[in-house]
Each structure stands twice: as C-alpha cells, then as structure tokens.
C-alpha cells in the first residue's frame, strides 16, 4: 500500500515541478522588474533581473541575441515573464530587453516586431468556484 501511495505521489508531484519552478521565476521577476529603467547599463539590468531566472533550466529559457547594426552593438536578453499551460516554451512567455552599446533602450516585444512563436491558451470556465479547463 505504501509503495502505491509513494508512486502516485511521485507521479503527481513530478508533473507539477517544472510549472512551479517557472511560476516562482515569474514571481521573482515581477518583484524585481520595477527597479529597471531605460538608460540603465546592461550590467545593472542583469544584476537585478538575472537572479529571478537562476532556477530555470536551459529548456525554460530563451537564449540572448547579439548583432551589429550601423556600428551599434545590439544585444537582446529575454526574461521569463509568463507561462501557458501547453507545456511549450514560446516567445510570448518572455519579455525582451534591448541594449544598444550596453545601455537599455527598449523593453517589450513592440520594440522588436512581436514574438515569433506563441503558446496555446486553453479555454476555461468557472463552476462552483472551480476552474474547468477544456
């Protein structure tokens, strides 16, 4: 009986783990992001926001972009700020921070043309104070 209980608990908890890690990172980001302002240096912004993403696995993150444009070094860092219940990691679950020559010049997808990938939202209804996803 104990083995059955333990196996069931492991199965149930292992499915929740990644979502809880992501949700914690999002909460930490939400707490820290108000301290960031346009014009801040890249090192200042990363010192404030990177700790919020530290517990995420590489599959739960989005790699930064770096390129030169008109003699300006453009770097875009993406921070996890959302999660869809579809299990996919898509662009719309991140907020981009754009740096030109090491200074923060823009925050958000509007500055770089919008996300390339988007998650699948699930419709839901509420019945007797319980959310039903379908």
Please state what every model-predicted region is.
Residues 2-7:
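Sec-dependent signal peptide recognition
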